[in-house]
From Swiss-Prot:
Subcellular location: Cytoplasm
Protein name as catalogued: D-erythrose-4-phosphate dehydrogenase
One Pfam short name: Gp_dh_N
Keyword terms, alphabetized: Cytoplasm, NAD, Oxidoreductase, Pyridoxine biosynthesis
Pathway(s) per entry: Cofactor biosynthesis; pyridoxine 5'-phosphate biosynthesis; pyridoxine 5'-phosphate from D-erythrose 4-phosphate: step 1/5
GO biological process annotation, one example: pyridoxal phosphate biosynthetic process
Encoding gene, per UniProt annotation: epd
Keyword Phosphoprotein: no
GO cellular component, one term: cytoplasm
Length: 345
């Protein structure tokens, strides 16, 4: 049984805990602690009731020291609640934590990861790209087999790299990619304002529900980290739209082979049924963003939107639940880190 602690119980942290149970991975993963500065009552309430993902199927109760996840048998899992702002003070050694899932979005350097290890954790997985000095960045389904025992401080990438990198991999292996551009059409996030208010990014001073808002993105750097051969070959822009969840990615690539739409789509279908099963999905149903809410795949390609211009310019629309899909990949990567360890976790 892999013992994990969740540091930061916001959107991703809560989804990770919920995914442990909804995916059935509670047979493999035991959450022993959650570190969050918020009060236990609010933590329990937001875990039980979620605007985007609905009511959690497990009953949640709490006291001042524990979140309790109840099973139909009457038994429950007691998860220790911590309220510590300094990593060095976290009792990971006493709790015998194997992997810390750091979902704060604040910490992300090698030094931050090593601080968790000094506190007693064996390994650390960050829920965002983090610094360039980390031991590895994993996009599950693409490069998780590169994990080694000595990789102690690891990044799970971002929701958008988890969405687009598997598709880039499939297209490149099948047709050869020369270059590409991406537009991320991303749901609003909690770093935006409900009504106009101050922010150091002037576009993010504006009300999230009233505008399509361009924001900075380093997605191209995330692609280069996984595929160094694509250095300076991809560019990306991102806009936030007035929805609370689910993201669409508009991918355009120039390839080396002359293809038709069906060639591209069939390549994705084949991958979704084989090498990227449970990571990539494919649909031709006339769906909209809400239909992909709570979808555990990293990427869902809408084949009706695939276009080919002049044989070698390919455009695709790729969906993802930027919260739920990513949370499920955090668990997959954590288990892959366990599998790569020489010392049993």
């Amino acid at each position: 049984m892999l013992k994990v602690a969740i540091n930061g119980f916001g959107r991703i942290g809560r989804n990770v805990l919920r995914a442990v149970y909804e995916s059935g991975k509670h047979q493999q993963i035991k959450v022993v602690a959650v570190n969050e500065l918020a009060q236990p009552e609010a933590m329990a309430h937001l875990l039980q009731y979620d605007t985007s993902h609905g009511r959690f199927g497990k009953k949640i109760s709490h006291d001042q020291e524990h979140l309790n996840v109840h099973h139909e048998s009457g038994e429950y899992d007691a998860i220790r609640i911590l309220h510590l702002s300094e990593i060095e003070l976290l009792p990971w050694r006493d709790l015998e934590v194997d992997i810390v899932l750091d979902c704060t979005g604040v910490y992300g350097s090698k030094a931050d990861g090593l601080a968790h290890i000094e506190a007693g954790a064996k390994k650390v997985l960050f829920s965002h790209p983090g610094a360039n000095d980390l031991d590895n960045t994993i996009i599950y389904g693409v490069n998780h087999e590169t994990l080694k025992d000595e990789h102690r401080v690891v990044s799970n990438g971002s929701c958008t790299t988890n969405c687009i990198v598997p598709i880039i991999k499939v297209l490149d292996e099948a047709f050869g990619i020369e270059s590409g551009t991406i537009t991320t059409i991303h749901s609003s996030m909690n770093d935006q304002q409900v009504i106009d208010a101050y922010h150091n990014d002037l576009r993010r001073t504006r009300a999230a529900s009233q505008s399509i808002i361009p924001v900075d993105t380093k997605l191209h750097k995330g692609i280069e980290r996984i595929f160094p051969k694509f250095s300076n070959k991809f560019e990306a822009i991102s806009v936030r739209v007035p929805t609370v969840n689910v993201t669409a990615m508009d991918l355009s690539v120039t390839i080396n082979t002359n293809v038709k739409v069906n060639d591209v789509n069939q390549t994705i279908v084949n991958a979704s049924q084989c090498t990227l099963r449970n990571i990539v999905d494919y649909t031709e149903s006339p769906l909209v963003s809400i239909d992909f809410n709570h979808d555990p795949h990293s990427a869902i390609v809408d084949g009706t939107q695939t276009r080919v211009s002049n044989g070698q310019l390919v455009k695709m629309l790729v969906w993802c639940d930027n919260e739920w899909g990513f949370a499920n990949r955090m668990l997959d990567t954590a288990l892959a880190m366990k599998a790569s360890s020489q010392v049993e976790l």
